Amino acid sequence: MLKYIIPTIMLMPLTWLSKNSMIWVNSTAHSLLISFTSLLLMNQFGDNSLNFSLVFFSDSLSTPLLILTMWLLPLMLMASQHHLSKENLTRKKLFITMLISLQLFLIMTFTAMELILFYILFEATLVPTLIIITRWGNQTERLNAGLYFLFYTLAGSLPLLVALIYIQNTVGSLNFLMLQYWVQPVHNSWSNVFMWLACMMAFMVKMPLYGLHLWLPKAHVEAPIAGSMVLAAVLLKLGGYGMLRITLILNPMTDFMAYPFIMLSLWGMIMTSSICLRQTDLKSLIAYSSVSHMALVIVAILIQTPWSYMGATALMIAHGLTSSMLFCLANSNYERIHSRTMILARGLQTLLPLMATWWLLASLTNLALPPTINLIGELFVVMSTFSWSNITIILMGVNMVITALYSLYMLIMTQRGKYTYHINNISPSFTRENALMSLHILPLLLLTLNPKIILGPLY
């Protein structure tokens, strides 16, 4: 495990000792090397976990998320270059240090073996994200967004700490590998209802569950590009990862408690998809589409069948790459037109044909076109939900239609139509941006050929 943690820590002195001309080259190249070494984690067997030490372990659930985390740092650095070109050298270095520390915390969160360590690192990811949003965001509303983000996350996760201390006192251990064998069945009593809520609420706020999702569009819209990318791609997946890990302790209580949350998610999935159709702001649309995709994951995790677990993990990875790519595309529009309003960016296909190709690919993966892994994840979730209750197929079908509608609406609004007069003098697409998009879409296309490596521990 240290072969990922120590190089990540050494990125910080590398950044601070680099000259102004070399700072982006050094940090991006080194982080790309780290992300390529992370591919070695694919080399493990499906049914056992790699116990690195008494502190860290990884199994086939955390491995894809780990690789996604490490893959994202060079992409965030590539995407932020234009955004930071006006800043002075110290601020650039500070920004890169924030991204590196965020990656460090995330790697340790996904591999932590003790639940308390997991909780501490889960909270630690809040700090760099908050600094990135409130310091480098675009508008002054970023402070409001940061406050929402901070208080939703903190209020959600304080009960989790109390619940973990209670579990530590009753069971005697918070080790993931021990808990599988030591855990007592949780029967339904009032105290256990509150324990279940305390354990799940932190992750449901993070996912986010419909109704607790208000911080997400604000944070996404106000964050700089790197903040949006890491928030959509990895920080939302922390909620899903935590839920998959902690449902182990809460059986058979989940069978009784899951109903209202499944209903809320199925309803919220349709509602947020419909909200997407009425958005004028490009980033806000992508943020709401994230809520609707994550609602599927919540439903899948709460149903607790092997198929739904596989669907949830596949959908999390697919959505991480897709939404990150969409945010990059929205940012490349924003850098040229200086506005996130979709109406002001019409007809870009005639000016930037290669960018239009990336937009098409990203929109199609977002609406879960076969044979992408987005579709594989969604199909697994839909089938397992259908076998749980037949009536859900109506809601799922409506959701798929609306998802296709808003994805194509986003594509048509930005690419087609007669272009407005103020975009006659925009710059062409850079090699940096094309490399960035291809590094997002290549993993998606390659995973299409071999999706079993992201289907989680139950495959």
Curated annotation (Swiss-Prot):
What is the official name of this protein in its record?
A: NADH-ubiquinone oxidoreductase chain 4
Task: Specify the enzyme's EC class, one word.
Answer: translocase
Q: Which GO terms describe its molecular function?
A: NADH dehydrogenase (ubiquinone) activity; ubiquinone binding
Q: In which domain of life is the source organism classified? A: Eukaryota
Ranges annotated as spanning the membrane: 22-42, 60-80, 94-112, 116-138, 147-167, 196-216, 224-244, 256-276, 284-303, 308-330, 351-371, 393-413, 435-455
Query: Which Pfam families did the record assign?
Result: Oxidored_q5_N (PF01059), Proton_antipo_M (PF00361)
> Is Ion transport a UniProt keyword of this protein?
no
Matching PANTHER family, A to Z?
A: NADH-UBIQUINONE OXIDOREDUCTASE CHAIN 4
- Assembly with partners or alone: Core subunit of respiratory chain NADH dehydrogenase (Complex I) which is composed of 45 different subunits.
State the UniProt keywords alphabetically. Answer: Electron transport, Membrane, Mitochondrion, Mitochondrion inner membrane, NAD, Respiratory chain, Translocase, Transmembrane, Transmembrane helix, Transport, Ubiquinone
Q: Under the cellular component aspect of Gene Ontology, which terms does the record hold?
A: mitochondrial inner membrane
Annotated catalysed reactions = a ubiquinone + NADH + 5 H(+)(in) = a ubiquinol + NAD(+) + 4 H(+)(out)
Stated family: Belongs to the complex I subunit 4 family.
What does the record say about its membrane topology? Multi-pass membrane protein
